[in-house]
Amino acid sequence: MMDTFSCNSYEQNHPHDDDIDIDAHDHDSHGGDHQEESGWTTYLDDFSNQYRTTHHEENDHQDKSSYSLLATSTSLVSDAATHAFSGKSFPVNFPAKLKFGRGRTKKICEDDSLEDTASSPVNSPKVSHFEHIQTPPRKIEDYVSSSFVMGNIRGMGDHQIQIQEGGEQKVTLMRNLIDGNNNNNNNNMDLRSRGLCVVPISMLANFNGRC
């Protein structure tokens, strides 16, 4: 009886001890989950923050580089525009291989001996000197020999033509003489047939002198 009363009195005095223990256990379990969750979240937050900062720095660097390139290009364009507007021309320096020999042409044009080459190029000593240099000696000898041979052939041809012409003249002369003699003989024969004799006047003169 005494024990029953003591248990009841203890329960009356401590009616919520079990609830307190359960709540404490639940609180402990929830606290551990919260601690675990907070650890993962901090790790993820750190990773995301690091990625964001890195990506932001790269974007800033790209923006700065693009801005610097843009500023440089605009400055170059503005400089070119100012030089073009001011009328300044940039000298173009060609290499020596691309000058196309203009200096030599200028020297030739400034030569006094070539001033009258349009009207009389043969009289210019420069032109005659160039012709003498440009014609090799072998070609000159060939030209001289060929001209000599051609001249001889032409001379021989002219001589043969003259001989032929002379021969033809002689032949025609002989033919004319023969024809004349034949005509005279024919005339004499006609006179003789008529009873007349042809006597030269000199014979008559001599005959009269003798008489």
From Swiss-Prot:
Name the Gene Ontology biological process terms.
xylem development
The record ties this protein, via InterPro entries, to:
VUP
Q: Which residue stretches belong to region Disordered?
A: 1-40
- Major location (coarse): cytoplasm
Q: Where is the composition biased (Basic and acidic residues)?
A: 13-37
Phenotype of gene-disrupted mutants: Collapsed xylem vessels in the inflorescence stems.
Q: Which UniProt keywords apply?
A: Cytoplasm, Nucleus
Disulphides = none
Biased composition, Polar residues: where in the chain?
1-12
Q: Name a GO CC annotation attached to this entry.
A: cytosol
More details: Plants overexpressing VUP1 exhibit severe dwarfism with extreme short and round shaped organs, and display extreme longevity before senescence.
PANTHER family referenced in this protein's UniProt entry, alphabetically: VASCULAR-RELATED UNKNOWN PROTEIN 1, VASCULAR-RELATED UNKNOWN PROTEIN 1-RELATED
Q: What is this protein called?
A: Vascular-related unknown protein 1
Q: Which organism is it from?
A: Arabidopsis thaliana (Mouse-ear cress)
Q: Which gene encodes it?
A: VUP1
